[in-house]
Amino acid sequence: HTIFQRVYVDGVGEGHLSGIRIPESNWPIMDLSSNAIICNGGVNPYHEPVSLAIIQVPAGSTITAEWHPTIDDVNTTESIRPDHKGPVIAYLAKVPDALQTDVAGLSWFKFYEDGLSDDGTWATDRLIANAGKVNFTIPSCIQPGAYLLRHEIIAVHKAETYPGAQFYLRTLLTIFVFEVETAATPQMECAQLNITGPGSVVPSPTATFPGAYGSTDPGITVDIERLINYTVPGMPAEG
């Protein structure tokens, strides 16, 4: 159970809930075919008022995303339960308007992923050790303009069958985990960015949500108690 609720740009905080489309509930998304897998919302209605802030981000800068169980800004050291193991992922999609509400059909490219390390620790373990914060670098070469940042945690501790993986995601402008868990559960939100800089690259490959993940993907349906290697879902990350 966790929610992406604060962004820092090169160490400078943008304010609590600012620039992020935050759901009221930290319940995860379970259905890979649902449009809620894009930026949350829908089954998890957004916290009102939805932020109209657009976060100014120079290309090449370091983004820090901060996750906590509730949006009341009280549990600032807790992030996600230690038994919720899984990868942490970040995507960007170029958009005409960072405040647009229609997110269907966008072309997303993955620029960050962290999964299972050789020492047996997960991205979520590192998130917990860093008090709910994860850092990633915005590619320095990409075209300037309006973007949505899709930030996601996929809990795969009970993902032996589908639906089981728990998807926690947010778009910059989380989801609660059901206690009877039998599949991967993603949590995601989307943040609203304006990226500046002289870049001209249109990254590829891209993917659309729903569709980027399949129920039989090895990173979605997986028994982590019998793992040798773990494949992070989706396309390779392009920095």
Swiss-Prot record:
Glycosylated position list: 75, 135, 194, 229
Any one Gene Ontology molecular-function term assigned to this protein's record: monooxygenase activity
Names of the cofactor(s): Cu(2+)
Cystine pairings recorded for this chain: 39-190
Cofactor note: Binds 1 copper ion per subunit.
Record field: catalytic activity: [(1->4)-beta-D-glucosyl]n+m + reduced acceptor + O2 = 4-dehydro-beta-D-glucosyl-[(1->4)-beta-D-glucosyl]n-1 + [(1->4)-beta-D-glucosyl]m + acceptor + H2O
Family assignment from sequence similarity: Belongs to the polysaccharide monooxygenase AA9 family.
Record-given protein name: AA9 family lytic polysaccharide monooxygenase C
Protein species of origin: Gloeophyllum trabeum (Brown rot fungus)
Lineage: Eukaryota, Fungi, Dikarya, Basidiomycota, Agaricomycotina
Record gene name: LPMO9C
